[in-house]
Amino acid sequence: MAVISKVTYSLYDQKEINATDIIISHVKNDDDIGTVKDGRLGAMDGALCKTCGKTELECFGHWGKVSIYKTHIVKPEFISEIIRLLNHICIHCGLLRSREPYSNDINLKELSGHALRRLKDKILSKKKSCWNSECMQPYQKISFSKKKVCFVNKLDDINVPNSLIYQKLISIHEKFWPLLEIYQYPANLFYTDYFPIPPLIIRPAISFWIDSIPKETNELTYLLGMIVKNCNLNADEQVIQKAVIEYDDIKIISNNTTSINLSYITSGKNNMIRSYIVARRKDQTARSVIGPSTSITVNEVGMPAYIRNTLTEKIFVNAFTVNKVKQLLASNQVKFYFNKRLNQLTRIRQGKFIKNKIHLLPGDWVEVAVQEYTSIIFGRQPSLHRYNVIASSIRATEGDTIKISPGIANSQNADFDGDEEWMILEQNPKAVVEQSILMYPTTLLKHDIHGAPVYGSIQDEIVAAYSLFRIQDLCLDEVLNILGKYGREFDPKGKCKFSGKDIYTYLIGEKINYPGLLKDGEIIANDVDSNFVVAMRHLSLAGLLSDHKSNVEGINFIIKSSYVFKRYLSIYGFGVTFKDLRPNSTFTNKLEAINVEKIELIKEAYAKYLKDVRDGKIVPLSKALEADYVESMLSNLTNLNIREIEEHMRQTLIDNPDNNLLKMAKAGYKVNPTELMYILGTYGQQRIDGEPAETRVLGRVLPYYLPDSKDPEGRGYILNSLTKGLTGSQYYFSMLVARSQSTDIVCETSRTGTLARKIIKKMEDMVVDGYGQVVIGNTLIKYAANYTKILGSVCKPVDLIYPDESMTWYLEISALWNKIKQGFVYSQKQKLAKKTLAPFNFLVFVKPTTEDNAIKVKDLYDMIHNVIDDVREKYFFTVSNIDFMEYIFLTHLNPSRIRITKETAITIFEKFYEKLNYTLGGGTPIGIISAQVLSEKFTQQALSSFHTTEKSGAVKQKLGFNEFNNLTNLSKNKTEIITLVSDDISKLQSVKINFEFVCLGELNPNITLRKETDRYVVDIIVNRLYIKRAEITELVVEYMIERFISFSVIVKEWGMETFIEDEDNIRFTVYLNFVEPEELNLSKFMMVLPGAANKGKISKFKIPISDYTGYDDFNQTKKLNKMTVELMNLKELGSFDLENVNVYPGVWNTYDIFGIEAARGYLCEAMLNTYGEGFDYLYQPCDLLASLLCASYEPESVNKFKFGAASTLKRATFGDNKALLNAALHKKSEPINDNSSCHFFSKVPNIGTGYYKYFIDLGLLMRMERKLSDKISSQKIKEMEETEDF
């Protein structure tokens, strides 16, 4: 099939509809001929098509038509377009609403876009009547009546016939079409002679169950039947129009309906594009529960017999396979045979006689049961990133479940508690070859962004790795027994005794070095814990091996070590019993006694405080502060438990070094002090969204406690441990948390999945070009992909070494640091980066040497400098800044840290060039990779926990998925969180006093009212401690009261005095007279006074000022003060003295003030911060997404394709159901370049292996052939001449 390079959309014209010869004229009959279920409309449900005789896989369906007897029916989706056009013309005479376009001076084809727009505005002018002297009628406003289902005159609601509108629109001369933005004949907006009946293929049945019996209906077929019925009855225009609208889009005339119609099946989540084209059900697939298998490797997948006997693979007949196919036929292993000449598929059954069908000519194929070592794609849903779907070799395994190697369980987020996986056997040989390379686990070993291995040991293998390293005094036989099948090549090197370290050296098998970890292939660390053997760790031995050699060696280490760990466990055993956890009750009894004693002390102290408040001895704290103090006391109790357990673990290790539970803790697997605290100490405070449960009826959560009880246990503090067991009320509190978490998980899964799809759709067409730049279509997004122009899985985070005077080249390093340090001090100067990005893991090639053999200091500096200059020019074209690379090499290879030979230095830089040249290929789908990594991480995060920054009643800066969602949606006109930072606290305090909301009621005033002869007197007594606590002054309180009364419309006359009652209290006396009705207005005044006498912006949040240590440099810090405030606009800060105050606005304020590039930087850092600690490696995908959102002149939401030239098909698959309608209306022509369009037209997209176009220069072959023939002919002539000489 020819490659489709361009697609044009348009509306069907009436001639095309009339051209079909399948006439539908019956509503119902016995054989369905002439009905909307006519077999001539296409093949369905196994029946061949009666028009072309093909099956439903080959027949694309045929259109029918029903006569509408010269009635004019508007195409429902274009009603608004018709109304738009009618606003430009006079409905009486059909002329445009301005005489100017008819002028002889104007040639519409020569007008500029600007002049055309001006002319169009004149047509839309507010003139009341027609300029045409023969018409002079007032202009009519036409609208569409949902009630009457027809066009009406808006003024008097009189029907306007479709035929009249049709006549007026088709009478508009073609030369005026550009002016009215008409792109095709207006008649195409109507059906006139016939209405089209679509083929059966686009009307799939909708199945449902009634009384356990499957039924199926087809609403579209029913709605088409109604149209045919009305046409046969020769019904009124409105009746047919209504039937057509109900079939096309019922929402045009009815708001609250969910009936299925054409619009429904092309929009929303389950539209036909998504269900049948973008993704659909496939043949040759299987699904089963998964289980672990120790007999298969990371590159294999175990398949049970029933799947192997059901799935079939194709073998194509050619000169190489014909003998094999004959053998398979002879041994009765062939299930199907396809004869290409006869276009016939034959099922071969036992004892079935087949005559003259099997010819075995090239192009034929046979299907046999799937064989071992065939490549098969399998995966676990949800497939959040590409490590969830891989292609491995099939192995036959026992039982009824799919078996996977435990090494890949982490990458697929799989455990073996009933998880299911699916598999699909691809039939196209090209697809099989491609998947067996690109999706093979060895290819996918290292994470695309993180760079660490995605496969590794799990569960008891981690403990085995720890124990194996510590084992001593093994004889050769014991070593060979542990190594099993891998022991044949073990070289004892004359030794008699061996340790676990020797076994690791043999397994590593390479002379590899790594600072503090490996020396010549030998582990020099004190212990082997989980960091060395599990997935997604930078110190993983498999990762270091693959950095040193290739992924093949890395995978081999995982396969061999996994086998050896399992051998070790089967020989020496490992088990954890309850006795390991709790040898006796002494420790738990001691902890319980401590907990009971401490909680009683806390309760006693709290009760004393509450009593003193009640007795008036002390002034109460604010509610938030009181809750903070109680929480801090309970936290101290929790920390006490953890300290006791840590001491207990340390003591147990001394007394019993072989305690298996503590071995697990040391190995970094499972048990930590917090988990032990839940089991042995106390279950702790139960929280919902980070807060204790809120009180409900009678000021309590559960009826187990007294009304308004302040008991911490009544708010969800569970004192008992799990060993002791929970009481009824404690169990309810734990279930309260479980209920909220399970609800959150259900909701968050849906929300994160929706955003993930949007981000992937947004970023899918972003690829690396041939120059190592990131582009989307023809738009340049980034000059250097991954900042290093090296594949993300090759780049490596390394320690950031700060300048130090003890370093060689200190001045040069210091100068470089001053150029790049801004990038490493981030998050409002609160954080200093500890890591930076190295172009590759060069540390595995660093081999220490002696002073005598080392390269000269000057030579090494020159080498680094020359290499970086060369790379800057030849690879980065001096456009991108690569100072960070020079800084890394100068610090990590610094002679003051390590001495290396000249050969080592040359090796490192040869590898550097090798990575630059060969790792990052043009077409790398960096957009999809980044989108998947971001999505996978925020999905995990949303399901694991919800966390925020502030706890002191301030506005909470949300972290996690919610905030990420807000940032990518980029909603306008919402308040933004503005952060102000300064070393001068007074400047922040002036802002705080003006903005922080404080009302009279918060100061706990004692308000009394008395009536004097001619006035009311209100006494307001306030304790000055409350005024001080609110960080305001007595004058501010006086101003608050004064301001409220002066603005009050119910007060007729007023006066005010302030008195100092005593050293603690101040009294404000207000004298009042009210307007009539006096009693009512007095009541209103007293009711609103505590809240209405206020200052600041009304908000439920306080504005506390907190201090922190800010970094100016790695060795320079200063004390800074910070506060966050919610503002709509920065203009509100305009009247304050904010000199030397750093203001960090939100994204839209950043854009308004500093422009698009600043907004990009803000978005990148804000998105990264939502992930919390330990996710610095996500900077690159966050930067890429931020760069895309800010690729135009204004930030653009992930929900929209406002600026980019997104294709119609991309919009349609994204969920825009109007995209195809608009494209057809505007007769759009588009190239087939982007992912969605390529998918639709079966074209290889320009990403990955489809980026480069491969071709053969036939002209070269022809020239070569001519040269050869010339050479041969001249040689023959020479031979003939020689012969003639004789």
Swiss-Prot record:
Catalysed conversion reaction: RNA(n) + a ribonucleoside 5'-triphosphate = RNA(n+1) + diphosphate
Matches recorded under SMART domains: RPOLA_N
Keyword Transport: no
A GO biological process held by the record: DNA-templated transcription
Entry GO CC: DNA-directed RNA polymerase complex; virion component
Record-listed E.C. numbers: 2.7.7.6
This protein's record includes keyword Nucleotidyltransferase: yes
Lineage: superkingdom: Viruses
Major localisation: virion
InterPro entries, alphabetized: DNA-dir_RpoC_beta_prime (IPR045867), RNA_pol_asu (IPR000722), RNA_pol_N (IPR006592), RNA_pol_Rpb1_1 (IPR007080), RNA_pol_Rpb1_3 (IPR007066), RNA_pol_Rpb1_4 (IPR007083), RNA_pol_Rpb1_5 (IPR007081), RNA_pol_Rpb1_clamp_domain (IPR044893)
Assigned keywords, A-Z: DNA-directed RNA polymerase, Early protein, Nucleotidyltransferase, Transcription, Transferase, Virion
Molecular function via GO: DNA binding; DNA-directed RNA polymerase activity
Subcellular location(s) of the protein: Virion
Job of this protein: Part of the DNA-dependent RNA polymerase which catalyzes the transcription of viral DNA into RNA using the four ribonucleoside triphosphates as substrates. Responsible for the transcription of early, intermediate and late genes. DNA-dependent RNA polymerase associates with the early transcription factor (ETF), itself composed of OPG118 and OPG133, thereby allowing the early genes transcription. Late transcription, and probably also intermediate transcription, require newly synthesized RNA polymerase.
PANTHER family membership: DNA-DIRECTED RNA POLYMERASE, DNA-DIRECTED RNA POLYMERASE III SUBUNIT RPC1
Subunit: The DNA-dependent RNA polymerase used for intermediate and late genes expression consists of eight subunits Rpo30/OPG66, Rpo7/OPG90, Rpo22/OPG103, Rpo147/OPG105, Rpo18/OPG119, Rpo19/OPG131, Rpo132/OPG151 and Rpo35/OPG156. The same holoenzyme, with the addition of the transcription-specificity factor OPG109, is used for early gene expression.
Similarity field: Belongs to the poxviridae DNA-directed RNA polymerase 147 kDa subunit family.
Protein name (Swiss-Prot/TrEMBL): DNA-directed RNA polymerase 147 kDa polypeptide
Source organism per UniProt: Variola virus (isolate Human/India/Ind3/1967) (VARV)
Gene responsible for this protein: OPG105
